[in-house]
């Protein structure tokens, strides 16, 4: 993890898409993985080492599972529905990295929204019509 965002050594998205033999029903399973990461500030390297919060120096690995499906309705309409982040896993709570304004609280910057799923579990429904 650097000062801008977590950079795990390993992260991936694995998608399994099964076109079932039943009425054109398509089933999708997605696994999103973010490996664990440690702040550069806890490094033994003198150029990287600086003050940090020990409680958030390491972020554990995160797994998110999504499930969806689609089915054609007639020749020109497709229905799609699914659930992202089925387990409703919350993002890691990270203390303020500045170590100045809020040393004992999370302030407003309590996670990395560009890296972790901050919406929690959400259900979606989609209709696609082709003309």
Task: Please describe what each predicted stretch is.
Residues 2-72, 88, 96:
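C-terminal beta-barrel architecture of Gram-negative outer-membrane proteins
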Residues 32-44, 70-131:
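C-terminal beta-signal and adjacent terminal beta-strands/loops
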């Amino acid at each position: 993890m650097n000062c801008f965002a977590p950079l795990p050594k390993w992260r991936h998205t694995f998608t399994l898409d099964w076109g079932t033999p039943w009425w054109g029903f398509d089933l999708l399973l997605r696994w999103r993985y973010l490996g664990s990461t440690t702040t550069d500030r806890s490094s033994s390297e003198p150029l990287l080492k600086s003050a940090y919060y020990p409680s958030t120096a390491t972020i554990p690995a995160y797994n998110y599972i999504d499930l969806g499906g689609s089915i054609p309705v007639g020749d020109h309409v497709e229905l799609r529905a699914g659930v992202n982040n089925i387990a409703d896993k919350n993002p890691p709570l990270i203390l303020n990295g500045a170590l100045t304004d809020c040393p004992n609280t999370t302030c407003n910057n309590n996670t990395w929204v560009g890296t972790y799923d901050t919406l929690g579990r959400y259900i979606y429904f989609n209709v696609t019509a082709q003309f």
